[in-house]
Amino acid sequence: MAELITGDGAFTENQRHVLQVIANMMIPASGTLPAATDAQIFPGILKRFAENTEATEQICDHILTAAVQQFDADFGTLGEIQSERVVNEFRDKQPELVRFIQICVASCYYKDSRVMASLGVRDGPPHPGGYPVDRTEWSLLEPVRVMGKIYRKV
């Protein structure tokens, strides 16, 4: 069995490689923007995957097994085209797990200050300064106000 990599939620080298390939396929580097596998972003993604080890193991097991079945090779030795084929097949067969991957990768990627700055969003928490909110039609909330309290007071 592959040796465990410390600091990554106890993922094996093979599992870490699978997650890295998937994250890079989702969000590759583009212009001045970093890839999801950037050294400042990817550790957070691994932590997020470690929050649900069952789903993460299912993802990695499926992809590692598919690589052997399709190409009689370890996923880590596959070329880019072969890796994409394995991951795309996984995407088609496991939509629930793909949603989990998307949440893990995107939520961590958009926490990065470089990414947020490129979107024109101020880095840091929204309070105490807050974000500007467009004026809206507050009368749309009138039915909610009229309804009154719908919760039990404790």
Question: What residue ranges belong to the model's regions?
Answer:
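Mature-region segments of soluble proteins
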Residues: 2-5, 16-24, 33, 40-154
